């Protein structure tokens, strides 16, 4: 794709999200979603492979269905309330339709089937945009309508997302699918706390985006797409490989890394609201994600790939490309836990 065209498309994607973030009118929000969806399709298809075309078609059909449900919910809300403002959804049917539409856009269970397939069919750079930037707009609308959402519906979908995000990643060898299932699980953690403390959802989203951006950048740097290719990188780029392993542990929520902080604060907030069974169940299901990240780290760092020569390390390492954003992203992704007492001020 030529740079001028890419700049125009990327600016449209960003403009669509910014319209959703800044508008308090339902029609403008819907227009922002449509701008964002139509502009992201060429980015997903930039490889011009049959798999990328299939992934883009799946994404388009899912997002179009979600947009239709969203518009239906908006119209029902307009019929009953007579208002276009986002913050007020007095009708439970309209609230349910809007919630389902937004969770479908996020790829939460039971509307999660498109996320692994689409992520696997596109390039690493497109997958990075899909699993980070594309989550901001739907979550911002959920944040605004959180007082009107049915908590039981959202908690049920959140629990299903955490379960499926853990189970789905267990037998995967493709790194993009592993990150897609991890994204589904993280969406479950974000939405379970939404009706109790929306600020914690924003904090969780920020840490999730930082960790996922760092992981995708390192995968692009190493050209790693499978667990096998990742296990071959340690003797070429040992520092990068060790950073990837730390980021994976952080994504799994292992203390004392950054990914543990939002889970800790969410469990604490749920227990403050006299909920014991839900945070216990969420903590147990989070072990599924941690397990497949631990297994991936073990196969990468602690086992050697069969080789004909006896040399463990290459005599000359590959020169690392300079990525300006990577050092601060890695620091935030792995060393944010000591800042948790300061984060608790947000509550």
UniProtKB/Swiss-Prot annotation:
Which biological processes are named by the entry's GO terms? mitochondrial electron transport, NADH to ubiquinone
Q: Please tell me the species this chain comes from.
A: Phoca vitulina (Harbor seal)
Q: State the protein's name.
A: NADH-ubiquinone oxidoreductase chain 2
Q: Does the keyword Amino-acid biosynthesis apply?
A: no
This entry carries the following GO cellular component terms, namely: mitochondrial inner membrane
Look up the EC number in the record and give it: 7.1.1.2
The residue ranges crossing the membrane are 3-23, 25-45, 60-80, 96-116, 122-142, 153-173, 178-198, 200-220, 237-257, 274-294, 323-343
Please indicate which superkingdom the organism of origin belongs to: Eukaryota
To which protein family does this belong?
A: Belongs to the complex I subunit 2 family.
What keywords does the record list, in alphabetical order? Electron transport, Membrane, Mitochondrion, Mitochondrion inner membrane, NAD, Respiratory chain, Translocase, Transmembrane, Transmembrane helix, Transport, Ubiquinone
Question: How does the protein's chain sit in the membrane according to the entry?
Answer: Multi-pass membrane protein
**Catalysis: reaction(s):** a ubiquinone + NADH + 5 H(+)(in) = a ubiquinol + NAD(+) + 4 H(+)(out)
According to its UniProt entry, the function of this protein is described as:
Core subunit of the mitochondrial membrane respiratory chain NADH dehydrogenase (Complex I) which catalyzes electron transfer from NADH through the respiratory chain, using ubiquinone as an electron acceptor. Essential for the catalytic activity and assembly of complex I.
Q: Where in the cell is it found?
A: Mitochondrion inner membrane
Any one Pfam family here would be Proton_antipo_M
InterPro entries according to UniProt: Complex_I_Subunit_2, NADH_DH_su2_C, NADH_UbQ_OxRdtase_chain2, ND/Mrp_TM
Question: How is the subunit organization of this protein annotated in UniProt?
Answer: Core subunit of respiratory chain NADH dehydrogenase (Complex I) which is composed of 45 different subunits. Interacts with TMEM242.
Q: Give this protein's Gene Ontology molecular function annotations.
A: NADH dehydrogenase (ubiquinone) activity
Q: Principal localization?
A: mitochondrion
